[in-house]
Regions:
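ATP-dependent carboxylate/acyl-activation modules
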Residues: 102, 108, 315-321, 437, ...
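Short acidic-hydrophobic, aromatic-tinged amphipathic segments that line or gate anion-handling sites
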Residues: 75-79, 414-424
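Active-site beta-alpha connecting loops in nucleotide-dependent enzymes
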Residues: 46, 314, 336-410, 417
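Acidic, Mg2+-coordinating active-site environments of NTP-dependent enzymes
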Residues: 7, 67-71, 179-331, 356, ...
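N-terminal leader/targeting and accessory segments in enzymes
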Residues: 1-86, 90, 355-356, 381-382, ...
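Phosphate-binding loop of NTP-binding sites
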Residues: 83-218, 224-233, 430-431, 453-460
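Short beta-strands and strand-loop turn motifs
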Residues: 67-68, 97-103, 128, 179-185, ...
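Residue-level signal for inorganic ion chemistry
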Residues: 9, 37, 56, 87, ...
């Protein structure tokens, strides 16, 4: 059976048909269209999807949702974005399984992927999740619209930059379980303070089903604020963390030389031991949230434990690569997709545990507003604690940190400040040695992924 029959598409969108077609997939990017897919011609500030209709059908589209008549099979609607939202709502309405929503300042994508791995194993392949970082007003309804009708578990990441944005997303997702991974100064440029971020993240609870469960970080300074907000909408709340007050809490952990972490955790019904393939306390915290969610939606905890032992690092979010250097190899840690003060500190802490020579390539942290100088200067402390041997800072907003480090900070050896990723790559290529560990981390707009691509591809 197709993902969407023609009758279902008409019922969901309320559009006028021209031609009859079913859809096996859904996309709004003509480059992602496969045979039998439905193409949404969305209009944005930068471009208009109607300009790519021919390309979409050349790539195999079965039909399109359009707001202007075209010479291909289509359904004509007044607003294609509203039609996408309507199809997302229809997908959620027909889904008979359990749905989890994931948000937070840090760790959304990693937690979403770990939870998907756990529930996909638990359901023998009947789990669905939002791909990439499709967590905004377009990505969330698209991810819902792609959900197969027989899905047992749906996992959806929801992000926001401003207050009020999550309210609309969670109304679409209507989760049975909502996770807030943590609250930290990400996107603080758009908020008065962290409390404002906490309030905005807490909007995710407003969409909970009547039997909904809120999962919140017990160790976070904004726990009480989140807990108060959650109790207005959730039937029950579950806290996770390292604190003895946590409902799901860490009892013990041991790091292995291979980078794995052996964990003993207390859940509501049992004590559980499992291996986590990713290093770091932030990943331990994420894994506790995952277990809390698996338990909340009735998943298999044993399967979840096995899945977390097999997690691979995500591109731009912790993936590790052995790269070729003269006379041998070096380890590259790819954190090039995102950066904020909390994730920078956590990642540098893990870098500090690595044996051998350490290099950190750090790009500007964006969307920090007036607090940007303060937060960039504060990176001196985790850099010093990690005893990084060579630090390459990238971007104008890193200048203030470069000046501080050059003035002398104990534990920081050598630094370079570069204007661009290209310049940083040239410096890095001159410095790389056998057995080095290189961390590349910065906001996505800094383009540090180009450094990773060059090193992994063996280019210089």
């Amino acid at each position: 059976m197709p993902l969407w029959t023609h009758a279902e598409l008409l019922a969901a969108t309320g559009g006028a048909p021209s031609g009859v077609f079913d859809a096996d997939g859904v996309a709004f990017d003509s480059r992602e269209i496969g045979k039998g897919d439905l193409f949404f011609a969305l209009k944005g500030e930068a471009t208009d999807g109607h300009l790519f209709i021919e390309k979409a059908f050349a790539n195999g589209a079965a039909g399109a949702i359009v707001s202007e008549p075209v010479d291909f099979p289509h359904i004509l609607v007044t607003d294609t974005f509203e039609a996408l939202q309507a199809l997302g709502r229809a997908a959620r309405l027909r889904m008979q399984g359990r749905v989890v929503g994931v948000t937070g300042s840090v760790g959304k994508t990693g937690t979403k992927e770990a939870l998907f791995a756990a529930l996909d194993r638990s359901s023998r392949g009947k789990a669905h999740r939002s791909v990439k970082s499709y967590n905004n007003h377009v990505g969330v309804p698209l991810s819902l619209a792609r959900m197969p009708r027989d899905t047992e578990y749906g996992i959806f990441e929801m992000g926001m930059n401003h207050a009020g944005e999550l309210r609309g997303l969670t109304a679409l997702v209507r989760p049975h379980c909502a996770i807030v991974t943590t609250i930290a100064p990400a996107h603080i440029e758009f908020f008065k303070d962290e409390s404002g971020i906490a309030d905005a993240k807490a909007e995710v609870f407003e969409g909970l089903t009547d039997d909904g469960v809120a999962i919140i970080p017990r160790d976070n300074v904004h726990f009480d604020r989140l807990d108060t907000a959650a109790r207005k909408y959730a039937k029950s709340t579950v806290s996770f963390g390292f604190s003895e007050k946590s409902d799901v809490r860490l009892l013990d952990h041991v790091s292995t030389k291979g980078g794995e972490t052996l964990i003993t955790a207390k859940l509501s019904g049992a004590t559980m031991c499992y291996c986590l393939s990713q290093p770091g306390e932030h990943w331990i915290s994420n894994s506790l949230a995952v277990l809390a969610a698996v338990e909340a939606v009735g998943g298999d905890l044993a399967a979840a434990g096995l899945a977390m032992a097999e997690l691979g690092g995500l591109a731009g979010r912790g993936a590790r690569h052995q790269i070729a250097v003269q006379n041998g190899t070096a380890l590259l840690i790819d954190e090039s997709y995102n950066a904020n003060p909390a994730s920078m500190s956590a990642t540098l802490s893990e870098l500090g545990k690595v044996d051998g020579r350490k290099i950190a390539v750090l790009g500007t942290m964006k969307e920090l507003g007036d607090k940007s100088p303060e937060y960039h200067l504060a990176l001196a402390e985790p850099l010093a604690a990690a005893k990084v041997d060579f630090t390459i800072l990238v971007g104008e907003e890193m200048q203030i940190l470069a000046e501080k480090l050059r003035a002398g900070v104990e534990g920081v050896s050598v630094i370079a400040h570069c204007a661009s990723a290209h310049e940083a790559l040239e410096v890095l290529n001159r410095e790389l040695r056998v057995s080095d560990t290189v961390l590349v981390k910065g906001s996505n707009s800094m383009g540090l992924s180009a450094i990773v691509s060059s090193l992994v591809g063996g280019k210089s």
